[in-house]
């Protein structure tokens, strides 16, 4: 169970890093928001899913 928690936590950190870099780039480009709106929303949805998964898995690890 610990390895699943660690992999999920790593995925959360990786997605967070990608969103921190990617979202400002999307907003800075001239037509980036209209073209990449779905990608940004997908990334945010995955981020929320991973936050809840880490919270649930944390109760099993500790």
From Swiss-Prot:
PSII is composed of 1 copy each of membrane proteins PsbA, PsbB, PsbC, PsbD, PsbE, PsbF, PsbH, PsbI, PsbJ, PsbK, PsbL, PsbM, PsbT, PsbY, PsbZ, Psb30/Ycf12, at least 3 peripheral proteins of the oxygen-evolving complex and a large number of cofactors. It forms dimeric complexes. The gene is psbZ. PANTHER family: PHOTOSYSTEM II REACTION CENTER PROTEIN Z. It is a multi-pass membrane protein. This is Photosystem II reaction center protein Z. It is found in: Plastid, Chloroplast thylakoid membrane. NCBIfam families: PS_II_psbZ. Belongs to the PsbZ family. The chain crosses the membrane at residues 8-28, 41-61. GO terms for cellular component: chloroplast thylakoid membrane; photosystem II reaction center. One of its GO terms (biological process) is photosynthesis. It comes from Oltmannsiellopsis viridis (Marine flagellate). The keyword Transmembrane applies. May control the interaction of photosystem II (PSII) cores with the light-harvesting antenna, regulates electron flow through the 2 photosystem reaction centers. PSII is a light-driven water plastoquinone oxidoreductase, using light energy to abstract electrons from H(2)O, generating a proton gradient subsequently used for ATP formation. It comes from the Eukaryota. Keywords: Chloroplast, Membrane, Photosynthesis, Photosystem II, Plastid, Reaction center, Thylakoid, Transmembrane, Transmembrane helix. Disulfide bonds: none annotated.
